[in-house]
Regions:
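Conserved beta-strand elements of the Class I
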Residues: 153, 375-377, 549-551
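Thiamine diphosphate
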Residues: 1-150, 300-510, 515, 520, ...
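Glycine-rich anion-binding loop/nest that anchors nucleotide
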Residues: 157, 432-433, 552, 578
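Conserved acidic/glycine
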Residues: 1-32, 156, 160, 164, ...
């Protein structure tokens, strides 16, 4: 460890503290104790290319711990990425390139957004899954084309280790025998409340060794040579690696080792103390040219070596006449994995009737052969959800090119793993029962924030399957899904709408939630593929006069149409509107909305879910026929009757409201 290393590390510390002090918020403790690790990663290990930051074989860095973000931004700045002094000065400010929780921005060196504690672990695992999949696709074309061998590094804190989704992702990584995955854990045993001895039991090293990780634990966390040795050993271990840094929080601060240094700016005296201790008297937000050159030269020297070998392999690949290989390289270079699925190309027999879960299996397998980049799985629910492609062979280290992923009962990790895979350009899906939505909600929000086209398939969508009891009967989940920004939720009524949903999903670059029933439903008269793109459409037009409108989604459309037919015999002429996507309908222009649902006409909504969001459609709250309480456990028809949501009860309510 030379003086140039020491100086650069100390400048990273002070620069990061300047950012926190300028923002008047942040976490100086982790910045001070992890600066040697961050510097060593960039200076001695990381294969990144500041002049070509989106190069597809670059190493990835994921910050599961948001607290370390000012240190990461400072390192990017020192390394020559497009993070300016002004960006650092605007840390945590509106519209800045340096938000407190990093947001996906590949050109700036930010490979993933940071969410809740532990979320980045699953994202890192997903990136590794995708790397392995692509790497083996390329090697399948030519065994010498090792074009994708990057490593993913994930920074962790004690909070990440305590997260529930963390254990799900860790165990999945071991089950998949992943490699090229290194976790860098700041084990400072402190949060804002104080020491963690009573909430984070010891023996972390033994725990991860027992799981199957490569584990190294460093007490000397300031020695660049030793840190580099540990990281390199983990990288080359052939296993997921956990490198534990037994740090003292807030190293060199007046409050070193105390919880007060966990969060909040340092005092002026403490900041001045650090500058004196490090003999750094540059103005705030300044770093020396010497330190920039010292770090850049190490990164460039390593890059030149790796790129020469890689470019030779890439030239070899480009000379191979293979459409498959070309499509892989194009995806990796552009990030686009377009899949063409045109619903109208398929004819549905008139007598078609089956569970939408069964129909969904068939549609997935119509899409499957269209692209090698379409894959996914379920959280221990494939037997009932049938979200499986082709046969029942699953992806593993022995079968890395299989397209089915067995996530196990890990809904939380599944969503984050899917996000990591989508960051690499794959079109992925994951499924579970709708009642388990809350288990994976954080991952859905991260998909939406990063704009990743992940498809979430939720089955068993209502109280029609009530035998298990209220804890496993959805009630407000549809409302939650429909109110996630930048996500489109679909609830198709039949096979036509289901196929239209998939055409829309594959044509859009935002995440989607597809909610489907286990009910057996017929091909409905008036149903069509194209109506899905508008969100809602007239599935049954009134005969002559318009006495009222019923709006429904999913399997309730079947009941709504029958109610309309029956009440026509009693003199009520009713239009039925199918609403496969309320999100899309509400984004249509007012003229279209008025054409489908005239505001002057009494409009009733029928849906076996919470009715809160339907006040934008129904004429009045009493015209929302919904389920706004926990359901009962029991035989479905008895439960429906008890909750006055059986067919006869609904028909009476509609007749009463329209009369």
């Amino acid at each position: 460890m030379n003086q140039s290393d020491i100086k650069a590390i100390n400048e990273l510390k002070v620069l990061s503290i300047d950012m926190i002090n300028g923002a008047k918020s942040g976490n100086p403790g982790i910045v001070l104790d992890m600066a040697p690790v961050m510097y060593t990663l960039f200076a001695r290990v990381l294969n990144v290319y500041p002049k070509n930051p989106t190069f597809f074989n670059r190493d990835r860095v994921v910050l599961s711990s948001a607290h370390i973000s000012p240190l990461y931004y400072s390192a990017l700045h020192m390394a020559g990425f497009n993070i300016s002094k002004s960006d650092l000065e605007h840390f945590r400010r509106l519209g800045s390139s340096t938000p407190g929780l990093p947001e996906l921005n590949n050109p700036l060196g930010v490979d993933a957004s940071t969410g809740y504690a532990g979320d980045g672990i699953g994202i890192s695992v997903g990136i590794c899954m995708a790397r392995r999949y692509f790497a083996n696709m390329i090697l399948n074309e030519d065994k010498k084309l090792n074009l994708l061998d990057f490593t993913t590094y994930c920074f962790l804190s004690d909070a990440d280790i305590m997260s529930g989704s963390a254990d799900e992702a860790f165990s999945f990584a071991i089950a998949q025998n992943l490699n090229n995955l290194v976790f860098l854990y700041d084990a400072n045993n402190m949060n804002s409340e104080g020491p963690l001895d009573d909430v984070l039991p010891g023996g972390i090293e033994k725990k991860f060794m027992a799981m199957g990780f490569y584990v190294d634990s460093l007490k000397n966390t300031e020695n660049v040579k030793e840190i580099a040795r540990a990281i390199e050993a983990g990288k080359n271990s052939g296993k997921p690696a956990m490198i534990i840094f037994r740090n003292v929080i807030g190293k060199d601060s007046f409050n070193m080792g105390k919880n007060i240094v966990h969060s909040g700016p340092l005092s002026m005296d403490d900041t001045a103390n650090l500058r004196r201790k490090y003999n750094l008297f540059l103005p705030p937000f300044e770093i020396s040219k010497d330190s920039m050159i010292h770090l850049n030269s190490q990164i460039e020297e390593r890059a030149n070596k790796t790129l020469k070998k890689w470019n030779d392999l890439y030239s070899r690949a480009k000379n191979i006449n293979s459409d498959s290989l070309n499509s892989i390289l194009t995806l990796l270079e552009t990030g686009n994995s377009n899949i063409s699925f045109i619903a109208s190309n398929y004819k549905i027999n008139d007598g078609y009737r089956e569970s939408l879960i069964d129909s969904n299996y068939k549609v997935l397998n119509l899409i499957n052969p269209k692209s090698p980049f379409f894959l996914g799985g379920s959280a221990s629910e494939y037997v009932t959800s049938k979200t499986i492609l082709g046969g029942e062979t699953y992806q593993s280290s022995k079968n890395p090119l299989e397209k089915n992923i067995r996530f196990g009962t890990r809904e939380r990790a599944m969503a984050h793993i899917l996000n990591g895979m989508a960051l690499m350009g794959l079109r992925v899906f994951g499924s579970t029962k709708l009642c388990f939505l809350n288990e994976c909600l954080s991952g859905l929000k991260m998909s939406a924030m990063m704009g990743l086209p992940v498809t979430y398939i939720f089955t068993h969508d209502s109280l029609y399957f009530s035998e298990e009891g209220p804890a496993r009967i959805p009630n407000n989940e549809l409302t939650v899904l429909r109110t996630i920004p930048n996500m489109i939720t679909y609830r198709p009524a039949d096979i036509y709408e289901l196929m239209g949903c998939y055409e829309n999903i594959l044509n859009k670059s935002v995440p989607s939630s597809l909610v489907i029933t286990r009910n057996s439903v017929p091909k409905l008269p008036g149903s069509n593929y194209a109506g899905v793109s508008n969100g809602g459409y007239i599935i049954k037009k009134e005969v002559s006069k318009l006495d009222g409108i019923i709006v429904s989604s999913g399997s309730e459309v079947v009941s709504s149409m029958q109610i309309a037919y029956d009440l026509y015999q009693k003199g009520l002429d009713i239009r039925v509107v199918s609403m496969p996507s309320l999100n899309l309908f509400l984004n249509m222009d007012k003229a279209y909305q008025e054409t489908v649902i005239p505001s002057s006409v009494k409009t009733i909504v029928i849906e076996a879910s919470s009715g809160l969001i339907w006040n934008r459609i129904a004429s009045s709250p009493d015209m929302i026929l919904s389920i706004d309480d926990f359901a009962y456990g029991g035989v479905p028809i008895e439960v429906l009757t008890k909750m006055e949501f059986d067919y006869d009860s609904l028909k009476l309510k509609v007749e009463s409201l329209l009369n």
